[in-house]
Amino acid sequence: MSNFKSFKKVMITTFSFLLILLQYSCRNKNNFPLKITIASAGKVQSIDPARASTIKAHQLLGAVGDTLYELNIDGKLVPKLAASMPVLSEDKLKIIIRLKKNIFFHDGTPFNSYAMKFTIERFQNIGTMNYLLNKKIKSIETPNEELLIINLNKPSSSIKGLLTSINLTAISPDFYKNHFNKFLNDKFIGTGEYKLESFSNDLQTLSPNNNYWSKKPKNNGINFVGYNNSSTLYSALRSKQIDVLLSNSIEDTLRYKLKLLSNQYKIHEGESKPIEISFISLRTKIKPLNNKNIRLAIAKSIDRNLIVDKVSYGLRNPARSIIPKVLKK
């Protein structure tokens, strides 16, 4: 990043997803917890992969659907619906992907290359951000049920993003055949370990997919609940109305209180690698910040660690880039 850009956006900290969990008090005869309630701020407007654009919608899709590949904690591709790693042609214009066998959608229809082609072409047709994909993909070939070939317009440096995109979560062509040209916001048929039971903007209920092709869920389902503000979320966790809180949904003051409870072993805390950042932006069009030398001086003298301690109670880490490390790989 150039010096100029580093002043325009002074990085404060990376943003971690923390999972704050309570002990499950209710279990069934198989010793599996009853439905787990996961809470976060905001609403889900759509579960249609072609439209979903928020982190909350993506989390929901990750539970009910599968992509061709996923990224592991080191940022490397791991086959999901794909049977092996993708093969790139010598001219880097073809991505050749072999698919797993004996995978079925929630409606009982088979997953295959034709279904994946339908998924991609539907997104190209109506996807909210389809312009990003249409610039990359020239055409799609399906020589047989287990082979998918993606032809690119030109060599791409973002193949990982293409193959792991949650917006390309596989969907059933039979179920979506009447929605190739329009969104289906409140229903979903995919291949994931959970099935969508019911959908509203505030509450989404999932049940286990007993025919899931990989490891089966070890619970009786999930309730995704949306709350309006931090205080309500915090109170719901303290009163045991919810089991899991995605702590990026609450203010740092309350997150700090939860951290103290975790230190006292009253709740369980899990932390993932950061995938978002927060920053302070300087108004560079007004004096004296329109002076590059002033911005240089600020950048060299600013105490990022002090800001982290005072603003976020030390819960975040200083950063010098607008791109989280996990997304750079």
Placement of each model-derived feature along the sequence:
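N-terminal lobe/hinge region of extracytoplasmic solute-binding protein
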Residues: 39-88, 121, 189
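Extracellular/periplasmic solute-recognition and catalytic clefts
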Residues: 197-205, 223-286, 309
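Short, well-ordered beta-strand elements
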Residues: 34-45, 94-97, 148-149, 192-195, ...
